[in-house]
Amino acid sequence: MCKGLAALPATCLKSAKDMKHRLGVLLQKSDSCDYGSSQGKKEKVSSSQRVSQEEVKKWAESLENLIHHDRGLAAFRAFLKSEYSEENIEFWVSCEDYKKTKSPAKLSTKARKIYDEFISVQATKEVNLDSCTREKTSHNMLEPTLSCFDEAQRKIFTLMEKDSYRRFLKSPYLDLVSPPRAGCGPENCKRAHAHALDCNSNIISQCA
């Protein structure tokens, strides 16, 4: 017997609305089925940019392998950002960039910027360093060299290696190499619509 929406419990109405939203998303996806060859080219480009399983396996071997890979560094950076501790990897990256400085005239300016941002007492992104390392790094600011942050960088690397890196390995970072979803061909689109309609019918029948 057909019942009006007013007769349905609130939970059922919510479920029906949720399913309506999902169905709308599926319908939008079906519109993409008519894309031309240009869409196929985009999918090939996207596929080629995926990280290989071999590369990701190396990430689990060591933190060094992870952060010396562009995509690995980006993934680890995003993970640390989600934990509100991205200052550690940002400091490490800044030190790596600093060591590549070729102009002696720029050393002092770049060193001071890194120090003020990550090491000084009033640093906006202060990293966790022991007092001895912090004091030694502060002393190095008197005559900055390419190695003036080496000890501090090593300490932060070790901190990440023993702490956040281990948590990263337990995170769903392997999703980066999960198989791409099947293309939205005619059959796939039909199955998607059928699945949505079946789910919608189940919700209504349960609420009746």
From Swiss-Prot:
GO terms for biological process: negative regulation of signal transduction. Signal peptide: none annotated. The keyword Lipoprotein applies. InterPro entries: RGS, RGS_RGS4, RGS_sf, RGS_subdomain_2. Palmitoylated on Cys-2 and/or Cys-12. A lipid is attached at residues 2, 12, 95 (S-palmitoyl cysteine). Expressed in the developing nervous system. Inhibits signal transduction by increasing the GTPase activity of G protein alpha subunits thereby driving them into their inactive GDP-bound form. Activity on G(z)-alpha is inhibited by phosphorylation of the G-protein. Activity on G(z)-alpha and G(i)-alpha-1 is inhibited by palmitoylation of the G-protein. PANTHER family: REGULATOR OF G PROTEIN SIGNALING, REGULATOR OF G-PROTEIN SIGNALING 4. This is Regulator of G-protein signaling 4. It comes from Gallus gallus (Chicken). The lineage of its organism: Eukaryota, Metazoa, Chordata, Craniata, Vertebrata.
